[in-house]
Structure formats: C-alpha cells, structure tokens
Amino acid sequence: MDPRSEVLLRQAELFQGPLLIAGAPADDLLGQLPQAQAWTWHAGDQAMLDSRFAGRSHYAVEPPDLPFDSAVLFLPKSRELAAYLLNALASRLAGRELYLVGEKRGGIEGAAKQLQAFGKPRKLDSARHCQLWQVTIDQAPQAKPLESLAERFELALEDGPLQVVSLPGVFSHGRLDRGTALLLKHLDGLPDGHMLDFGCGAGVLGATLKRRYPQSRVTMLDVDAFAVAASRLTLAANGLEGDVISGDGIDAAPTELSLILSNPPFHTGVHTNYQASENLLKKSAVHLRKGGEMRLVANSFLRYQPLIEGALGNCQVRDEADGFRIYQATHG
C-alpha cells in the first residue's frame, strides 16, 4: 500500500461520513474506507480503481458532483496544481475538514502553508516519511475556473506563431521545454495518414502536426486529465481540430498509425518511472502501419536506441544537442 495511504489509515476514525479522496493512489485505500469516493486525474489509476471499486472513482479536472463531508488531497508534484485542487475542495467544505497528505521529499511541509488561506492548519501525524495535515475551512473560497489559471504563450515557428495553452500540473507548464524545442526542428518529411502525439502535454507537437499536415488525422494521447484539457484548449486557440484522448500508455493508442511522435514522459509524481516510455518503444510496431515512422526526443543518457532497434529493426540518431537526442525509425 502507498505509504501516504498508510498514514491516512492511522487516523481512520476521523473519517466517519462521506469522504472524497483527491489524487487517490491505485491501492486498497477505498477498500479500507467504504464511505469514500476517489477523484483522480491519472487515467491509469482511474482504470485500476474502477476495476476494483466500480463507480467509486471519478476521472476529471474538477471535483465530482457528489456530496462529501470532508476531503483528503494527496499532494501532487506541482505547487500550482496543489493550489487549484485545494481551492476547488475548500470551496465545497465551508465549516468542515480538509486534509492534506504527502511525502516529506514531495514538499508536504511547504505545501501545508497553503492551507493557511482557509483556516488554521495543524499536523495530525508523521510516519513513513509522510505527514498528514488538517484544516477546518473557516473561510470557504470561491471556486476558481480552471481556465483562469491557464498560462498562455506564443511560439514563433517556421510556419507562423503557435498559441499554446498550458494548465497547472502539465509538463513544462507555461513554457517550451528544451526537448520539444529540438523535436520541433525535425518535423519535415513525415508520412501522411493517422499521426499520434504520445504524451501530448499542452499539445504543442500535436497542434504543430495538424497545422503542418492538415490532410492527416492527428490523435493526441496523455495519461493526465489536465494535459488532455490543455491540448484541447491549444487546438481551439489555433483553430485546429484533432482527437484528444486519455489513456495509460501506448496500449490506449490507435493502430495503423503513419507516425508516432513523442517527447515521452518519465516521471510519475516525484518518482522517476520509465515504464510508459519503454512500453512505447517496445510496442511501437503494433501501432504503426508498414512504412510508418516513429520520431522522438529523449535525454541523451537514456539507452533507447537498442529498444527501438529491437522493436522496429532500425534506428538512427537525427540530431543531438543540449543533452537530447532525436531518434527516427521506420516500421518495415
């Protein structure tokens, strides 16, 4: 079980009425707290929770429209996302209890200061390198619309400016990361057809593809509900259309693709996790049509080339700069 869940269960007597667990991990916490419902924005966690606790987990960027007497937030990595989530929960809990649980190395002590906006926070427990905090909502805030927290910026690209809309918690929130910047220079000569932006984030790559290859169908896939929402906003901001879907890894992607384009993720919360990226490489042949291409950017220290060669039989390094490599391979 997640150590944060274990700390929460040490205080299980506090949770007598309907409880909302925001950012719930995919463990047995709902089994131990039968009065609880989960709110998650991670498609993989949602699938696992729903398979075990059908109807008790809700995947969205806003709290589910359910009655609850108290709520627990599992602290996310992003401080901006934590602020949005705390505000969204506190707006529904006037005079009631809001709890915050997280790892010490994830910044729980600093994040607990954000509770001061709603009342007087106090630390209830500390164990397993985690802490549990509580605040009674004396001053319930107005819920902030998610779009009001969006960061909007413009990229000067070869074929004109691209408007980008980023949301809290999305990778490289509010700015263009170096890996994607390098990959944007290598979008020439791509095979038309059905293109996939894997791990789409704020939708920079997918929107650029759709504008540069308007006759192609573009699908954008991400595990994170906030990234899915941001990508849809980015498409709309540029007058573009595309399919933006949520799913946990390449297994959720269509088949018969002409292209897989990606700056693949390798973080889950504060932890490093290469599984989604390695599965993408190993299973790429299942999702590409014959003659289809995979083009991606990755940190130079990651040994992705042997995995790509093992899956597709070939791989070339198109470019290397700023600690990143561009890989290209074709499904023969």
From Swiss-Prot:
Write one Gene Ontology MF term. 16S rRNA (guanine(1207)-N(2))-methyltransferase activity
**According to the lineage, what is the superkingdom?**
Bacteria
Give the EC number(s) listed in the UniProt record: 2.1.1.172
Reaction catalyzed: guanosine(1207) in 16S rRNA + S-adenosyl-L-methionine = N(2)-methylguanosine(1207) in 16S rRNA + S-adenosyl-L-homocysteine + H(+)
Which keywords fit this entry according to its UniProt record? Cytoplasm, Methyltransferase, rRNA processing, S-adenosyl-L-methionine, Transferase
For the protein in the UniProt heading, the enzyme class is: transferase
- Asked if the Swiss-Prot or TrEMBL record annotates the protein with the keyword Manganese, the reply is no
User: Which is a Gene Ontology cellular component entry for this protein?
Assistant: cytoplasm
In which broad location class does this protein mainly occur, judging by the first location in its UniProt entry?
Answer: cytoplasm
Q: How does it assemble?
A: Monomer.
Recorded family membership: Belongs to the methyltransferase superfamily. RsmC family.
What is the purpose of this protein? Answer: Specifically methylates the guanine in position 1207 of 16S rRNA in the 30S particle.
Identification of the protein by name: Ribosomal RNA small subunit methyltransferase C
**Taxonomic source organism:** Pseudomonas putida (strain GB-1)
Organism placement in taxonomy: Bacteria, Pseudomonadati, Pseudomonadota, Gammaproteobacteria, Pseudomonadales
